[in-house]
């Protein structure tokens, strides 16, 4: 394997998107020896913090014979990744057996949520935005998605993002432990009978991971 180079993650990046741009599957990059410290600190290859360094092999080289008097197009093949989400309301009631339409970077998918309100769809590892419509009539819900923008759980911005998606927070995801963020943390802590610290402490992180999934 060619010598590794370091890629500095930006907002919206994950190991899968970084790997795909260099012609590799995410597992090849994630399991690379050069990412041992990253695996220890982040645990989840799909949740990075801007500034994280990801060791990546050099792009694969390949030779093709082509006439010189013509234009040629080469397409980089990438392995799709699984997008998974469970849809519930404030009372934890699932949006079960509901039709949905998911659009990701211009590609449309249709299906039905399962009995627990879940849906799964393979998407491009470099996808950035999506639009999800679930249900019809009075049960219709719309969600605007940004892939790769969730920060690690042990950061304030990571807690804000999860609290936002769970319906406890409607402010900016800015990494500031301000009054609005503390209020959202307190509401979440009270609902699940945690110590009301108004901080993103370990017990709160564990419960957020349980409720959110990562």
What is each PLM-predicted segment?
Residues 6, 61-81:
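Beta-strand-rich domain onsets/edges
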Residues 113-120, 181, 204:
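Glycine-centered loop-to-beta-strand initiation motif
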Residues 73-95, 166-168:
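Structural motif
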Residues 1-23, 78-83, 153-157, 161-162, ...:
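Primarily a LysM-type cell-wall glycan-binding module
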Residues 92-105:
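Short, ordered, surface-exposed loop/turn motifs in non-cytosolic proteins
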Residues 24-67, 190-214:
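Extracellular LysM carbohydrate-binding repeats and other cell-envelope/extracellular binding modules
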Residues 89-91, 121, 127-176:
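Acidic, Ser/Thr/Pro/Gly-enriched interdomain connector segments
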Residues 10, 107-116:
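Short, acidic Ser/Thr/Gly-rich low-complexity loop/linker segments typical of extracellular
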């Amino acid at each position: 394997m060619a010598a590794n180079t370091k890629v500095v993650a930006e907002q919206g990046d994950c190991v899968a998107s970084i790997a795909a741009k260099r012609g590799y599957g995410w597992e090849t990059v994630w399991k690379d020896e050069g990412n041992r410290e990253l695996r220890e600190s982040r645990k989840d290859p799909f949740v990075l913090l801007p500034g994280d360094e990801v060791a990546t092999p050099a792009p694969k080289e390949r030779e093709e014979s082509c006439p010189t008097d013509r234009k040629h197009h080469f397409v980089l093949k990438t392995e799709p990744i699984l997008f998974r989400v469970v849809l519930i309301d404030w009372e934890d009631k699932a949006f079960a057996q509901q039709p949905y339409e998911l659009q990701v970077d211009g590609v449309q998918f249709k299906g039905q949520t399962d009995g627990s309100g879940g849906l799964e769809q393979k998407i491009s590892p470099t996808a950035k935005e999506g639009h999800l419509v679930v249900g019809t009539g009075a049960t219709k819900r719309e969600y605007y998605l940004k892939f790769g923008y969730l920060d690690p759980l042990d950061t304030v911005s990571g807690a804000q993002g999860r609290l936002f998606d769970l319906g406890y927070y409607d402010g900016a995801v800015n990494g500031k432990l301000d009054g609005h963020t503390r209020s959202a943390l307190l509401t979440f802590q009270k609902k699940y009978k945690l110590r009301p610290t108004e901080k993103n402490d370990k017990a709160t992180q564990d419960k957020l991971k349980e409720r959110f999934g990562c």
